[in-house]
Amino acid sequence: MNISRSNSLSLKLTLLLTSTLTVMAGATIAPSLPGMEKHFSELGVANAELLVRLVLTFPALFIVIGSPIAGIIIDKFGRKPLLAASVLLYGLAGSSGSYLESLELILVGRALLGFAVAGVMTSATTLITDYFTGQARASFIGLQAAFMGFGGVLFLSLGGRLADLNWHAPFLIYLFAVSS
């Protein structure tokens, strides 16, 4: 382990900020669900109530499916390439609900978001274990958990504010990933 690399502020910030993405994946859009349900019900989409609920839960299903795949990708291509690709996919797939009008396509975007979260979670955690050992690792994982909790509160609150504008708006929060 290269001590100067593990003490790098940019490395620490990258790992902490990308860790906030995992928690915000599902809950950020929760405040927009009533507006989505109303919109798609008025359009006559069959089973709109059920499908809109799946918009919230789909990422979790695909995180479960994608996590072992992410581990295989890490072994083959490395941690940083997977993290970079996953963050990009996260921003694109997560924000898809801001411009898509098809509930089915939004569900596809949410599935892709789940795969992206799996990649972010797996690569960030693996990088933490690569760069930190002993007490430094334990402390950093504690800091990571704090960032995840803070991110969840911040992004859920922001999602609620944006949902007051329209149901598409909270999906824009996912573009934060591209800036991190």
Regions found by a protein language model. Name each.
Residues Q135, L143-S180:
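Helix-loop-helix hairpin linking two adjacent transmembrane segments in secondary transporters
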Residues A27, P59-P68, G152-V153:
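Residue-level signature of mid-helix packing/kink "hotspots" within the transmembrane helices
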Residues V64-E104:
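Conserved MFS/SLC helix-loop-helix module at the cytosolic interface between two early adjacent transmembrane helices
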Residues L11-V45:
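Extracytoplasmic
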Residues V23, A27, S98, G114-T122, ...:
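Small-residue-rich segments within alpha-helical transmembrane domains of MFS-like 12-TM solute carriers
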Residues M36-E37, I73-I74, L158-D164:
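Interfacial helix-cap and linker-helix signal at transmembrane-aqueous boundaries
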Residues L33-V64:
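Extracellular/periplasmic helix-loop-helix junction of adjacent transmembrane segments
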Residues L103, G109-M148:
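Cytoplasmic helix-loop-helix junction between adjacent transmembrane helices
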